[in-house]
Amino acid sequence: MKEMCMHYKSRLTEEMADIKAYMDMSCELKKSGNDLEAQILKDIAKDESTHAKHLIHILEKNDYNMEDTENALHVMLAEYKL
């Protein structure tokens, strides 16, 4: 199970990076007037945030302290208004 949890932690890092990348692209598209494309990328970022929350939950169930990561995710989501 430890190996699987390490995979989940790695995946969580990737999910958080993906959220940032999608939101950065969304902001750039919005500035260019591409509102539909910007909204699509924002929706994808929301999906990624759901995945990240699920991974945090799984890791917490396996006795990993994810408080700092969970707080960082909440700050990121608030910053992007997701």
For the regions a language model picked out, list residue spans one by one:
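Non-heme di-metal
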Residues: 1-82
